[in-house]
């Protein structure tokens, strides 16, 4: 996998993980405050977004108290939908690395068909059979470490 692709996947993962954390914390807040009004939920979500930003993004990007992670309005009408996105980025990178090992286009096509035929499995079971490893952030973190050194 080339460095640009790795960085693109990593950045997408980093970005959506923040929104996913806001989603999870917002739902925890809502369950703890079942009689909250829409305005109270809005204010809580903005506060949560700022907290997540300050903990995970401000040290890297420098801006303090950014509410931008609260921008996904569908986190309210599609509960716990956003936390699934990071898994997609993690799996994407593991598959990219796996396919990069194919010697030629035929090997790639054969491997793609093998993986497609695995059927409906849980994500981790699918990955074990597809690439021989659990779903893990280790491959992308190791690749990022290699790139930035």
Please give the residue ranges for each predicted region.
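C-terminal, non-catalytic "cap/extension" segments appended to globular domains
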Residues: 16, 20-149
């Amino acid at each position: 996998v080339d460095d640009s692709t790795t960085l693109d996947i990593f950045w997408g993962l980093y970005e959506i993980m923040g929104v996913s954390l806001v989603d999870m914390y917002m739902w925890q807040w809502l369950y703890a405050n079942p009689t909250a009004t829409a305005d109270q939920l809005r204010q809580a979500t903005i506060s949560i977004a700022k907290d997540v930003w300050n903990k995970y993004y401000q040290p890297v990007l420098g801006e303090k108290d950014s509410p931008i992670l609260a921008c996904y309005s569908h986190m309210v009408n599609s509960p716990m939908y956003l936390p699934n996105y990071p898994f997609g980025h993690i799996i994407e990178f593991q598959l990219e690395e796996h396919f990069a090992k194919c010697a030629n286009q035929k090997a790639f096509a054969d491997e793609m068909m093998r993986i497609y035929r695995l059927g409906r499995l849980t994500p981790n079971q699918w990955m074990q059979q597809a690439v021989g490893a659990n779903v893990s952030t280790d491959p992308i973190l190791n690749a990022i470490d290699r790139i930035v050194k």
